[in-house]
């Protein structure tokens, strides 16, 4: 029964297993490229069983975990939004703090702004130390060469008319400026915008120090009065600029929204990875995931378009604000200062701007250097990991070679045993042919001896049986032949004894050899299968590891090359900026006279810019409306994610129902309780572990085939199986033995059950109907029946 069932089910099961293995390999290839690692080197069925085991958690705990994860995500989003709003408000507050009163307020404002600025370096006199003085340090820790101000410029103080003045010991020399250079829009743009009030404070302080070093004590009083008026006007102007500088808040909110969108995209990708593992169980999830991916692509494209629009609007706003600010400053200077004061103010302004721009460039260069160092460290780590992986690959190869050598040895041993068995079979065939051809006095003595051995008669009965078959030998009784007869009889008895002993030995040895060969063949076949599986799994592991490390190295090299090229571009830009600033300093002095004549025309242009600002505000409102629509889309996506989570949870419950209770699963321990006579060797020989590798459909097909062939309903199957086993193991053996012995007594030969069973098996395979099978044994039994009752 087992033979023909295996014959029926083997091709389909092998095909399905091969297809499953191919799908598993494809799944591994897809998932291990996240490089996640792979996940693992385990087969898919083991990972599937692990997911089943993980899904055995009670439903209440899973629901609570899902609710807790959702609530924690919402809380983290709210906290991130609040922290970003507080940060933007703090920056706006620092921008609104304009200089008024005395220099102490300037120092406090600079301390607040420098604490929050991206240039986290040491400070001297409330100003960043980068580029100030010969002893100032660069971000890399080396002496700065960006300016040649003496060390004592920010050390002496003087109180005059209750105004604390940070007095310079000497005037600064040429500073590199580039006022028309527009900084590239980046994530740190709000730092630059927020430090505009700081630049105004630095300008005023620098003007005071210059006037105190260049004017006489009599002229200082009038100059201080003028500077006081300048401060009051600049404080009012700073308040108006702080209102205009509300754009960084919008930028911060947009950046926070972009970060939230990125976080949502990352979460969606994680959910996609989880859902991909359940693709084999539910095909409906594939369609839902495809919809989500399409929505993500559309949302990503729209977000890119919105970010481009925002960048364009930001550029316009920054340019317009800078132009309006320059126009108002020039108008104010024309009304309240002379031409010399204007020149000094503009030069101080350009120097301060150049100073701030150079600080920003230096900070960016320092940040890029840190990124390059980090990338180099990561590259070293990856090289170490690659060396370790190469060592592991070498070990795996050596293990594969050892396994191959063991497999070859086992195959050689199997061949030797097969050759020995064939040799003994030849010897037995030779002895059998010799006994069949043995004749004495033209009588078949050898055939008679073989039949007596088959019947199991004792040697003492040989003479009687021989005399019955050959009565002619009884007349030989003369004296001359009696002696020869006795001698021949003694020799024949000795030969018979020797032949019997030899035959018994040969038969016993042949049985032992057959049993040993069968046992060794089973062992070697199991070993060969196990070694082949191990070799395949290790080769797959090696290929996956090799692909994963190759992809990681390519990504890291690409990132390293990109950062390297960006650094080179930044260095080239910084050198160009320095050269252009030195050239433009001389050009600005010549162009100043022409700018004074053009100021009157700029007043008319200011009205035009105001209208353009209104238009830009309208566009900004449109963009905010678009962002609100995007937020509604994000909420819809979150709802779809929650529905997908519920679907995944329901699929896990369905999987749990399909898998059943693992505590009721049969293994060697549970089988030993109900069948104590079964040993571990017997349990392993039955091959029950193969059933764990079968799919749900394969296991159903196996049970259905059994029920159809046996023609037993499922309700009574477990009750009837013991009776079938008793019929096969006990009753069938007794009946076959009885029929065989009866046929031997009647016809002098045994029944050949194997050949008749093969004929019946071929008929069943052709028809697949047990009722139409005509067993050849029926004819033999009818012959026996006729012999006794006819």
Curated annotation (Swiss-Prot):
PTM (free text): Phosphorylated.
Stretches the record annotates as Disordered: 8-122
Main location: membrane
Coiled coil: 241-328, 361-430, 477-498, 540-658
Keyword Zinc among UniProt keywords: no
GO molecular function, one term: chromatin binding
Biased segments, Polar residues type: 50-78, 89-108
GO terms of biological process kind: ascospore wall assembly; ascospore-type prospore membrane formation; cell division; mitochondrion inheritance; mitotic chromosome condensation; sporulation resulting in formation of a cellular spore
Record keyword Coiled coil present: yes
InterPro entries, alphabetized: Sid4-like (IPR021750)
Cellular component, GO, one term: spindle pole body
Keywords: Cell cycle, Cell division, Coiled coil, Cytoplasm, Cytoskeleton, Meiosis, Membrane, Phosphoprotein, Sporulation
Bias (Basic and acidic residues) ranges: 39-49
Quaternary structure (record): Interacts directly with SSP1. Probable component of a SPB complex composed of ADY3, SSP1, DON1, MPC54, SPO21/MPC70, NUD1 and CNM67.
Function: Involved in the pathway that organizes the prospore membrane (PSM) during sporulation. Mediates the assembly of the DON1 ring structure at the leading edge of PSM during meiosis II. May constitute a physical link between SSP1-containing PSM precursors and the spindle pole body (SPB) and may facilitate the recruitment of other factors that are required to promote spore wall formation.
Name used for this protein in its record: Accumulates dyads protein 3
Species of provenance: Saccharomyces cerevisiae (strain ATCC 204508 / S288c) (Baker's yeast)
Origin organism lineage: Eukaryota, Fungi, Dikarya, Ascomycota, Saccharomycotina
């Amino acid at each position: 029964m087992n033979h023909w069932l295996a014959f029926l089910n083997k091709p389909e099961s092998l095909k399905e297993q091969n297809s499953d293995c191919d799908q598993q390999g494809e799944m591994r290839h897809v998932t291990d490229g996240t490089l996640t690692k792979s996940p693992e080197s385990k087969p898919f069925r083991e990972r599937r069983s692990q997911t089943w085991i993980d899904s055995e958690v009670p439903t209440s705990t899973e629901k609570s975990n899902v609710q807790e994860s959702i609530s924690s995500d919402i809380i983290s989003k709210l906290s991130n939004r609040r922290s970003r709003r507080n940060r933007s408000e703090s920056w706006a507050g620092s921008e609104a703090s304009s200089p008024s009163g005395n220099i102490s307020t300037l120092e406090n404002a600079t301390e607040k702004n420098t604490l929050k600025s991206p240039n986290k370096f040491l400070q001297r006199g409330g100003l960043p130390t980068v580029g100030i003085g010969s002893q100032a340090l660069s971000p890399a820790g080396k002496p700065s060469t960006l300016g040649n101000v003496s060390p004592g410029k920010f050390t002496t103080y003087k109180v005059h008319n209750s105004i604390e003045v940070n007095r310079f010991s000497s005037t600064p020399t040429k500073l590199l400026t580039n006022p028309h250079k527009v900084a590239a829009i980046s994530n740190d743009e709000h730092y630059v915008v927020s430090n505009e009030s700081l630049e105004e404070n630095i300008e005023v302080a620098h003007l005071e120090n210059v006037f105190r070093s260049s004017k006489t004590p009599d002229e200082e009083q009038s100059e201080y009065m003028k500077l006081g008026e300048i401060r009051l006007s600049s404080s009012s102007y700073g308040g108006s600029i702080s209102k205009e500088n509300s754009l960084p808040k919008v930028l911060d909110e947009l950046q926070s929204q972009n970060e939230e969108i990125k976080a949502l995209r990352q979460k969606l990708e994680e959910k996609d990875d989880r859902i991909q593992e359940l693709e084999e169980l539910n095909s409906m999830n594939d369609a839902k995931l495809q919809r989500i991916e399409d929505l993500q692509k559309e949302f990503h494209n729209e977000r890119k378009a919105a970010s481009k629009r925002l960048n364009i609007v930001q550029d316009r706003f920054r340019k317009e604000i800078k132009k309006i600010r320059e126009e108002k400053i020039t108008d104010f200077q024309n009304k309240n200062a002379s031409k010399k004061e204007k020149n000094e103010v503009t030069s101080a302004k350009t120097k301060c701007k150049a100073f701030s721009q150079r600080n920003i460039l230096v900070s960016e260069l320092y940040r890029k250097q840190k990124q390059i160092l980090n990338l180099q460290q990561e590259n070293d780590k990856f090289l170490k990991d690659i060396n370790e992986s190469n060592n592991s690959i070498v070990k795996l190869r050596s293990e594969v070679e050892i396994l191959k050598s063991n497999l070859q040895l086992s195959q050689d041993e199997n061949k030797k045993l097969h050759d020995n068995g064939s040799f003994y079979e030849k010897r037995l065939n030779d002895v059998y042919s010799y006994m069949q051809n043995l004749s004495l006095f033209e009588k078949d003595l050898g055939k008679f001896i073989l039949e007596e051995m088959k019947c199991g008669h004792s040697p003492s009965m040989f003479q009687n049986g021989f005399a019955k078959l050959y009565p002619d030998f009884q007349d030989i009784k003369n004296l001359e032949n009696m002696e020869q007869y006795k001698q021949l009889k003694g020799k024949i008895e000795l030969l018979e004894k020797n032949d019997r002993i030899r035959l018994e030995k040969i038969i016993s040895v042949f049985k032992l050899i057959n049993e040993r060969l069968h046992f060794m063949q089973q062992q070697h076949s199991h070993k060969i299968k196990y070694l082949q599986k191990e070799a395949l799994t290790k080769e797959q592991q090696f290929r996956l590891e090799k692909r994963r490390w190759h992809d990681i190295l390519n990504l890291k090299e690409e990132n390293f090359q990109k950062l390297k090229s960006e650094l080179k571009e930044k260095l080239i830009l910084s050198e160009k900026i320095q050269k252009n600033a030195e050239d433009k300093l001389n050009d600005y002095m010549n162009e100043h006279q022409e700018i004074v004549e053009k100021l009157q025309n700029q007043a008319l242009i200011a009205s035009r810019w105001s209208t353009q600002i209104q238009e830009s505000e309208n566009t900004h409102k449109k963009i905010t409306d678009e962002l609100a629509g995007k937020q509604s889309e994000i909420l819809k996506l979150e709802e779809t994610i929650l529905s997908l989570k519920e679907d995944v949870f329901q699929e896990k419950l369905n999987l749990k129902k399909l898998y059943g209770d693992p505590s009721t699963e049969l293994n060697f321990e549970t089988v030993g309780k109900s069948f104590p006579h079964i040993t571990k060797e017997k349990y392993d020989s039955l091959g029950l572990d193969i059933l764990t590798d079968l799919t749900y459909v394969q296991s159903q097909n196996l049970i259905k085939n059994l029920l159809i062939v046996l023609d037993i309903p499922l309700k009574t199957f477990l009750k009837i199986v013991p009776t079938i086993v008793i019929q096969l193991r006990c009753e069938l053996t007794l009946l076959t033995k009885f029929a065989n012995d009866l046929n031997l007594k009647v016809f002098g030969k045994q029944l050949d059950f194997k050949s008749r069973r093969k004929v019946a098996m071929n008929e069943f395979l052709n028809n697949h109907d047990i009722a139409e099978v005509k067993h050849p044994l029926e004819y033999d039994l009818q012959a026996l029946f006729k012999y006794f009752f006819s």
